[in-house]
């Protein structure tokens, strides 16, 4: 079917185009709201600036299609193939993309607010400047796998309040992304870059974040219980009032970091580099600080009750009012 025939039928009131071969068709700038393209072959199709609100692309093949600026709000893209598609500036508000393949696609400056991205493959996708507020990427046992965002470019992306539970963000670029109040429980962030990202009040419990770059990130009030943050770079990071209970912080580097009133109960901080860090009123109950470097750190009123501190380097640290492992108070 060519473009002219399809548009003629649509203008006559027909919306059912299921299973049609529309490979390479040019439908740019047209109005196809509510059309049913489920199962269609739309490889390489030109859908630039096309109105496709509430259209049905269930299981459609849109590999390499051009969808720049298209409006796909509330569209059904369940299981669709959008690999290597150009979705620059596309509107996917509240769209259903469950199980879709969007690997290597260009989603620069796209609008994905409230979209359902469960079990989606976004590996290698470009999501720079994309708005993903309120998206659902939640991992559900026996139903949906965590979304695949390995190596994805999410620089400056808006992910406020997004549910990324169980997602794989290994080696993803999340520099300067906004993840405030998002849910990243059980996420894999190994070797990801979150420099300058904002994660205030974000849920990050049980995540795997080995060798992550957190430079200058805002993690105030973040929930990081039982997270594996080993070998991470927290240079200049703000972790004030964060909850790191039971976290693995072995060999982290945190020069110029601020961790005031943070909780490290039962955390492993062995060989952590915390030189000069502000840990005022931080709580380290039953924490392990074997060979930790706390030289010149600020530990005023910190609580080290039952902590293992015997091999830590505390040279030059300010421990005024700190509670020591034996529950005594430090005195100059």
Walk through the language-model features, giving the residues of each.
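Tandem repeat scaffolds
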Residues: 2-332
